[in-house]
A protein has these predicted regions:
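Glycine- and other small-residue-rich loops at beta-strand/loop junctions that grip anionic moieties
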Residues: 31-36, 59-63, 83-84, 107-111
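C-terminal hydrophobic helical "lid"/dimerization subdomain
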Residues: 44, 88-139
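Conserved beta-strand scaffold positions in the cores of enzyme catalytic domains, especially
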Residues: 12-13, 81, 112
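CheY-like receiver
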Residues: 21-26, 49, 97, 121-124
């Protein structure tokens, strides 16, 4: 899950605390943080590592749906929080980006499963282990 973003230049660490140490050493925090893991503490952690007056973008559907965070952090930093919903109607745009070479789909960490392995695919996707970001079930 971390190799692909790192190959694109993202700063990748296992926790917000590790990221915060990196940013403290650089004396610079990112002005925009994209949180797409949906983890239980990820929303609050994204606020913690966003630069003052910056923006935290929460992508997808966080789990659990009710998120708990300290209002002190975004209030003190004067952060903007923006939620980005998923969309069903983006297939044509995505295929065009792949065709034009804007997105390199072959580098995207996807595991493919046969139809009879569908239960395993769902279990693997839910477990979020390893580098897999998506499970694809093929007939």
């Amino acid at each position: 899950r971390q190799a692909y973003p790192a190959s694109l230049g993202a700063v990748v660490r296992n926790s917000a605390e590790e990221l915060e140490k990196v940013f403290e050493e650089q004396d610079s925090y990112p002005p925009v943080v994209f949180e797409a893991s949906g983890g239980e503490t990820a929303f609050a952690e994204s606020l913690q590592i966003t630069e003052a007056a910056g923006k935290a973008v929460i992508i997808g559907i966080p789990e659990p749906d009710d998120q708990v965070f300290s209002a002190r952090v975004p209030r003190r930093k004067e952060l903007t929080v923006q939620f980005c919903r998923r969309s069903r109607n983006t297939l044509e745009d995505c295929l065009q980006m792949v065709a034009e070479g804007t997105v390199h789909a072959s580098e995207y960490p996807v595991d493919c499963f046969c139809l009879d392995e569908a239960p395993d695919a769902f279990a693997a996707a839910a477990a979020r282990e390893g580098d897999m970001i998506r499970a694809v079930v093929q007939p």
